[in-house]
Structure formats: C-alpha cells, structure tokens
Amino acid sequence: MNMFVIAAKSEGKYLYGYHPHIYSNLKQAENALKTMRKNGKLTERDKVYGLDGLMLVDL
C-alpha cells in the first residue's frame, strides 16, 4: 500500500465524507488524522484507509 486517505465510511461501500488529500506515507496520514481530530475538523468515525486503485482498503 503506497497511498492513504482519511475518510468516514459506512458499514457498506458508502462514504460519509473524506479529506481531499492523498498521503504517500501511512505515518503522515495518521499524524494528519490526529491533528485534525484535535482541531475538531474530524470525528472518531474518520480513520485512515489504504487506497488500492480507487478502492478503499481497511488497514
């Protein structure tokens, strides 16, 4: 996995929302998520997902 995004996903295939930035490093994505949660921009349902083409992959 070399691309990561921050998103909120339902139990099915649907997205509630996503942050429009693609990270090439898992650690960068996790740090960004932590910072945005602290600033109140994201909630606990948002998390880091790996991208496989255009599909979200749970990590």
Curated annotation (Swiss-Prot):
Record-given protein name: SPbeta prophage-derived uncharacterized protein YosB
Origin species: Bacillus subtilis (strain 168)
